[in-house]
């Protein structure tokens, strides 16, 4: 094997190893990148009743579809997204490139985000990250703010409203909590 081929293979395997480690880390502390179905995104945004001047947050924004759809629905909102999976983050940056004035994206963990200005938070997270941050949500979010969680409940919280599942389309429930 030539030295050039050897080094190209080493670079390829190194990049693959880093990619796999980052993916494993993201899955351990949050959730894997699984985009919410478009119909669910629309339902969640409709349920949030977005108004001019509101701030919305997606703590695991993935490819940015929730934030982008929210901004198209109500152009006078501010949208903030956090993502740990680099490929999804890059995809979100690309998809939201024409909405930079409305959408701010961060490549970091949302556990340390400032929630004091958030009016609505859209979640498609597993039970553990929701439970881990439940006290933060309750103490930092505005009174009257909404948390809309697709598929997973916040342990120990009573939902304000539940949008029923649609089994024939493989859609889970949407749990809406009011602070």
List each model region and its residues.
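Conserved SAM-binding strand-loop segment of SAM-dependent methyltransferases
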Residues: 99-110
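S-adenosyl-L-methionine
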Residues: 1-51
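Conserved SAM-binding motif I beta-strand of class I
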Residues: 78-83
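A short SAM/SAH-binding and catalytic strip from SAM-dependent methyltransferases
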Residues: 118-132
């Amino acid at each position: 094997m030539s030295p050039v081929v050897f080094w190209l293979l080493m670079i390829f395997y190194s990049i693959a190893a880093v990619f796999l480690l980052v993916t494993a880390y993201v899955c351990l502390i949050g959730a894997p990148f699984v985009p919410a179905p478009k119909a669910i995104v629309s339902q969640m945004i409709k349920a949030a009743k977005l108004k001019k001047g509101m701030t919305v947050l997606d703590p695991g924004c993935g490819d940015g579809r929730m934030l982008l759809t929210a901004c198209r629905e109500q152009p006078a909102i501010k949208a903030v997204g956090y993502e740990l999976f680099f490929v999804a983050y890059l995809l979100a940056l690309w998809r939201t490139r024409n909405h930079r004035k409305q959408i701010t994206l961060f490549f970091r963990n949302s556990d340390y985000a400032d929630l004091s200005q958030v009016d609505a938070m859209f979640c498609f997270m597993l039970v553990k990250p929701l439970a881990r941050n439940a006290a933060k949500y309750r103490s930092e979010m505005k009174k009257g703010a909404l948390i809309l969680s697709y598929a997973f409940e916040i342990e120990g919280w009573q939902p304000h409203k539940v949008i029923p599942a649609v089994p024939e389309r493989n859609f889970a429930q949407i749990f809406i909590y009011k602070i």
